[in-house]
Amino acid sequence: MSNYSCPRTHNKSNMSGRNEVKPISFSRGSFQIHHYSNSIHSPSLDGSPRQNFSQKYSFGSINSSNSSYDRSRDPSSVEQQLMREKSQALLKRKSSPMPKSSGLLYSTHTNKELSSIDKINDPSSNALICAGKAHLGYYKFSSNDNNKITLVHEFTQGFSSGSSQLNSLNPNLNKRRRQIKLSTIADVKSGFQKYNNYIAVCNNSTIISIYDINKNDNIDNPLVTSFSEHSRAVNSFDFNMTQTSLLISGGQDGQIKIWDLRSNSLSGSNKPDLNINAASDSIRDVKWMPGYNFSSFNQSYDGKQTGNSEYKFASIHDSGLLLKFDIRQPNQVEKKINAHTGPGLCLNWHPNQDYIATGGRDGKCCIWYIGDVVNDAPVTSLGSMTPNTLHTSNVNYYQSNATSLALPEMTINTGFPVTKLKFRPAYEKNVMDSLLAISSMGEEAEVNIYSLCRKFIPKHVLLTTSPSQGLVWWDKSLIFNTDRSNRINGWDIDLEPTVLDNLPKALATWRDIDGNGLLVIDQDSGTYTANEEYIPLVFDKRRRQSHRLLNPSINDNNSITKTKYLDSIKKANSNTIISPTSVEKTGNIKQPNLHSNKSIIGMTSPMYMTQFMPPTNSPSPLNEPLEFKGIQSPLIVALDFPHILNNMRLSKITSKKHLSKSSDIAAIKESPIQVFQYLARELEFSFSKDRKLDSRSSIIKRKSISDDSGSQVDVIKKIGFTDTTKWTNLINRKTDGEIAEKSSDRISALSTSSESIKNDIDEKSEHSKNNAYLNLEKKLSHGTHGMPEDAIEAQHKVDILIELVTICSHNASVYSYIDDVPNFKIWTLIKDSLLWDLKDITGIEEAINSNDSIEIKDKFQYFENLDHERALKNSSSQTQFSDIPSEIESFVTENPEALTSASLELDNDIEEGTKESKRPISNLQQQLKAENTAVMDTPSDVFVTATTDGGHFRDNSKVTRDENKIETNDNTNLLNIGKVNTENAIKIDSESVIEDVAPGSKSIEIPTLTRGRTRTSFIDTFMTNPLHNMERPDRSLLLAQDSAASLNDQSSPISKVSSIKSSSNVPHSLNSMIKLSQGKMHSRTRSIGKSPIKLSGFLSPKERSLSLPLENILKKNKSAEKVAHNDQFRPPWETGKLLKQLFNQAVETGNILLAINIITLFQDLYNITTIDVVKSSLLQFVEILHRYELFEIATALLKYCSWNNILEGNGGNSTVQLFCDKCGKLIVNEFSKTNFNEELKRTGNKDSMKKFGYWYCDACKKPNSLCVLCEKPMKKLVMCVLACGHEGHFQCLRDWFLNEGMNECPAGDIQVI
């Protein structure tokens, strides 16, 4: 689209008359966002003067229609048609797809403080007037000269001494004339028509000064006159648009004063022509009713004109009151409305409708109808009424100073105090098409432009460098503002994108905790214009007509009693009809007195004599909400998954219902302080062994407390589910007793799976558990003797990663206990990422995944027989492993007796186990119990069968289901092999089988399972484990778990699910991980490479790594780490990359605990950030812990952290604030720092940050003082000459004074140093 910009000197009119059209009203906006279809509007012509029309000012009677241009030059009908066609063509041109770029056309910076802005109402010049604390400037802007804003004249300079007129007007001004200083609450306004060269400002807090912009202060004093009758600060003043000589002002003294420039300019009188007392209620803003004459420009305008606009004005007060006056009856308030709950700050009239917009400190912008109440309004056309319209006055009601109980027609919640607001000066048939510009005195550096059609989404957001101070519409498209950075900005809103252009039109999002679980929105973006076919209720003849609030005269015999009146108001608010007894029928209703001379139509309708109806013919909150016919609201689909799932689950698990309202959790969640203290005590910040041993008793104590209070209600009950969740299994289980029985069977199965493990450690003996842990450490240290350095390094890294995995599980459970879902997900994600690292180090190949899944039942058995198991298989596609959050935690916490020294020696008899493993499959059960052999180190995704005759595998497709049933002596199923599928069986050449096979040995017949199960999500991990423990398991128990898991590997190795794909299934991976940590992989008597079964021809490259010695594996891992340094080869789940992103997110969101946890646990391993940042963060965190009286946590953190001298980080440091010696502002330079950082990330050039420093100022774009000798910026060490104050580089001044022996300053100071 072309960036065509209309010149601002086009023909526009300065309207003078007020067209009195009957209001198009509306009630309060509904709570839903309504979107309107596109509609074609007739182009609204601007309200500013047109250049082609010469100035012609008329000062006739008040009832005459004043015009701002020469009617003799009024364009003919042909010319008007051409103008309309050009305007429509221009609108079509602008309606084409526009690039989403800013519509900022003008921007200039001034050296003076600015606080207010207004336009010069002169059609011959594009001029603005800006005022501030010590500045009053006359500016001009031009669209032809690169869109520049130029300062033409400044009026704050000293005047000539010969100004007798000034002294005669106000002798006190003679003392101030040499130093004009405008007040900090300065306002500036420009006159109209004859007085369009006059501007009014506040010279100080109580004096209003009138300047003539056509006078040069070098020749004549531009000060025309001044008014100083206010006793306190003047907050606002305004010129009358029709009676242009009238000026109104309001101040803190609660006085409204009206001045006539004609009577005060020459007579020297300083008295106001009219004074209105507002009962000591400070006035924040006061405005005349505007008098635009839109009928002169829009031939389709059919409203009636009136001459009353020059008499009416409105004011907003500190108490929040909105008052409307008529100067013909100054002692009477026409309207009195409680507009805001706090102080009202500003107001603005609608250009052609009887509405006022007010803004207050309560953060609300309210639209009020302040026109006369309409009783019966037959509709002739949209926006007009018949001459028989009744105007009912409320004079007597407001004479009693009673406040109107009406609510606003619309409320826009901005969220910040509204200090400036102005309607766009354009004629609108439908008031809902009006645009309203709003700015704030807060920290919001923007100007919001709202369309009344969509009060929830602004149409335009005009961004500024700092908060806005003032704004003004030049015409219907161009708007100017001033901000705190002393900038003047101008936007063309036709070139500015709307907010809807950048919003998504369809959205689907999850809610993790309470409320609607899933929200889906699909809608059309809509427009910011109302439907032209929409007729407001005030003009709808199909609606029943009545009064607004029934405001009768106080002396009227038909008045309503106080009690019944309040009852009627309450019932009207609920849109219900009040009974006929609410009104006493004591006589006919009187005809109220009117301000106008129009005839009165009687109110004798029997409807008002029988009942009180909520008004439907006037814009009031008592009406029904606006009914936008033909507009389809957005479709919002809300699925409350947490509520559904909790009801389904708790209905089957009734004993767990009370846990959802646990008193312990409720006590923790009472305040954020208690939550922080709980997390600081429970989270693990270090994996030091000393601390773990010391805290083991506290962990056991915590476990007992948790067991006594019942199982934990997991957070996963409150989040969604997937297609593989276990909630259906929980629903299908019959009773809680069955669940408890199966849990007991699971423990008994574990206790009987290995008698040697049970005999070594008593589950009730904590002393033996500690001894086992110490023995384990000795064996691990003994296993490192004679190992290569690479193997020792890999073993050390595996030890650390395993410890970190357990810590992550513990921290995740801590957050799940308090229903903190986001942090629970983060720690689960970190744990899964660490398991990836473990997989890469150990070279464990992940298990086979297929579309189908099969349940493999082993030592963790819930069921008593196979038939019951297969019956439940139809209702769930998950295995029993999904009932435990992680093999690391569940086996340890529920079976602490499973650890023995025998578990550490399972690999010593590897050869014997290999020979024994070649027995027939029918003897496998006895073989496991009698010999206690270990699993053969065959990759989990390949299972082979050899025969003694060198032949191929025999067909196992005829194996029946009965052959797969294996019974133990204790009636516990240890192995369940499903139907065999031999199509994927691997056939090995006889030459690769007969090697190292003793003659006469029997063949091994173990079927191949080709079906795996689907990935288990983290949701399944915790949904199916409400008994998830919070304590972290001991390392000794972790190793014991792997020993038992190795038995399961021998029974069905192909059924293992990759630990990387699910954190709940890691037995096979951890088996090899622990073996590597024990230092046994390098010293085995038979490695995979020496296996009698050669699989090299059938293995993938990654699988072949399992048959290599440990040294080759480590070399391969090293080469992989080198490649990983390149970001394009790094997977998105790479741990170092993930942790850095999580750390940055924690810093940005203020998650202190997560940031410190990542630093203390992962800094040494993954180098998350710099050491300076680490020490500074730990120091600040220690201070926070001291603030919350967590001294023991702070001491433990300092004791076990990897860095020294944490507390000395700020011992000798001091904070020095540097201020710019040019503009006086604090040097922060965040803007340039951000730019240089982006350049560094984009280019990778480290020299980019060398440009950054604090030797320059971003605010004024100037460097600080230059070196007195070399005249270059001082970026590093600086020295200052105390005698004269000149500064210079240390090197320069050292050479000057020491090497060259000078004793004077390089600047040439005479004083000898």
From Swiss-Prot:
User: Where do the zinc-finger regions (RING-type) map?
Assistant: 1267-1309
State whether keyword Protein biosynthesis applies. no
Biased composition regions of type Low complexity, renumbered to the chain: 57-69
GO MF term list: zinc ion binding
Matching entries from InterPro entries are given as: WD40/YVTN_repeat-like_dom_sf, WD40_repeat_CS, WD40_repeat_dom_sf, WD40_rpt, WDR24, WDR59_RTC1-like_RING_Znf, Znf_RING
**Biased composition, Basic and acidic residues: where in the chain?**
70-83
PROSITE patterns noted in UniProt: WD_REPEATS_1, WD_REPEATS_2, WD_REPEATS_REGION, ZF_RING_2
Keywords annotated in UniProt: Metal-binding, Repeat, Vacuole, WD repeat, Zinc, Zinc-finger
Q: Where is the composition biased (Polar residues)?
A: 1-17
Its annotated compartments are: Vacuole
GO biological process terms, alphabetically, are:
positive regulation of macroautophagy; positive regulation of TORC1 signaling
- Ranges in a coiled coil: none
Q: Where is this region: Disordered?
A: 1-22, 38-83
Which positions does the entry assign to WD repeats?
Answer: 180-221, 229-269, 339-378, 442-484, 711-752, 795-837, 1100-1143, 1190-1229
Listed under GO cellular component are:
cytosol; GATOR2 complex; vacuolar membrane
Describe the function of this protein: May be involved in a process influencing telomere capping.
The record's comment on protein family reads:
Belongs to the WD repeat RTC1 family.
PANTHER family documented for this protein:
GATOR COMPLEX PROTEIN WDR24
- Record protein name field: Restriction of telomere capping protein 1
Q: Can you name the source organism?
A: Vanderwaltozyma polyspora (strain ATCC 22028 / DSM 70294 / BCRC 21397 / CBS 2163 / NBRC 10782 / NRRL Y-8283 / UCD 57-17)
